[in-house]
């Protein structure tokens, strides 16, 4: 990997190198490794996550070296730079008609793709459900047995270019029409109720104790989160600004399915 990384880093600093075969071959090799799940834009290292910046750079530089192509699928015509992912059956992936995954995204066995979209560089681990009209953005990292409900938007790193990908850890449940963008990290087995919107600047307020505890960019493991608001002063007066409220936790003493059901009932969370 060191030689690949060196080539990618050099091309990132000097885009003229994108005209050289050595560079384009290296970029395409990185994309192939991502597609196979052998290389990731971010990965767990111990109890932390490491962002592989050079891998993300390769994804960004893959676009300008690709040529536009036109192809047909039945009555539909497409004109794009990116190929689509193939080989779902032998990998044990269920793909419902109108689901789209780009080549360069890794999708593990046991994943179900309802009519949804998975962008290049993304990593979707085994047993995860990507429900109808959900979007998994470029380089986003989705763990095992995650449920991305209908209309969920998981942001990517390309448009605009972001420092870190969104990370959704194992067992998390992301409710309908949630938005998670700008490198937000959702911990294991967390539950986001419907319409929670998390950006890098969104206040996430734990209201389970005697005093509120504020954080940004990270939802702790097993947290149950709902949309909320807080009062902010502006020149024109005081107005409500959206935030997210941690109102409880999933209990680790029960299995995941029971814990999720109990959490939804106990806290009256819409999903």
Locate the predicted segments by residue.
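Terminal amphipathic alpha-helical/low-complexity segments used for targeting or macromolecular assembly
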Residues: 1-93, 222, 227-271
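Structural signal for interior beta-strand "rungs" in well-ordered beta-sheet cores
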Residues: 93-233
């Amino acid at each position: 990997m060191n030689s690949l990384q060196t080539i990618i880093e050099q091309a990132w600093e000097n885009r003229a190198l994108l005209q050289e075969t050595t560079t384009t071959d290296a970029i395409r090799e990185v994309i192939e490794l991502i597609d196979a799940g052998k290389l990731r834009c971010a990965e767990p290292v111990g109890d932390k996550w490491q962002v592989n910046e050079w891998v993300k750079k390769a994804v960004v530089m893959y676009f300008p070296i690709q040529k536009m192509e036109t192809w047909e699928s039945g009555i539909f015509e497409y004109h794009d730079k990116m190929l689509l992912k193939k080989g779902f059956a032998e990998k044990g992936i269920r793909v419902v008609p109108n689901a789209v995954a780009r080549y360069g995204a890794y999708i593990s066995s046991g994943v179900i793709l309802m009519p949804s979209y998975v962008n290049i560089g993304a990593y979707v681990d085994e047993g995860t459900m990507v429900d109808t009209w959900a979007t998994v953005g470029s380089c986003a990292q989705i763990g095992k047995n995650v449920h991305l409900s209908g209309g969920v938007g998981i942001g990517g790193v390309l448009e605009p270019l972001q420092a870190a990908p969104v990370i959704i850890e194992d067992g998390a449940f992301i409710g309908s029409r949630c938005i998670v963008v700008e490198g937000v990290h959702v911990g294991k087995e967390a539950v986001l109720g419907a319409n929670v919107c998390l950006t890098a600047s969104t206040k996430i307020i734990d209201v389970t104790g005697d005093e509120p505890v504020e954080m940004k960019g990270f939802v702790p493991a097993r947290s149950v989160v709902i949309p909320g608001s807080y009062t902010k002063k502006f020149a024109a007066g005081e107005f409500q600004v959206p935030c997210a409220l941690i109102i409880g936790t999933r209990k680790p003493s029960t299995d995941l399915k029971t814990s999720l059901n109990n959490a939804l009932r106990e806290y009256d969370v819409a999903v």
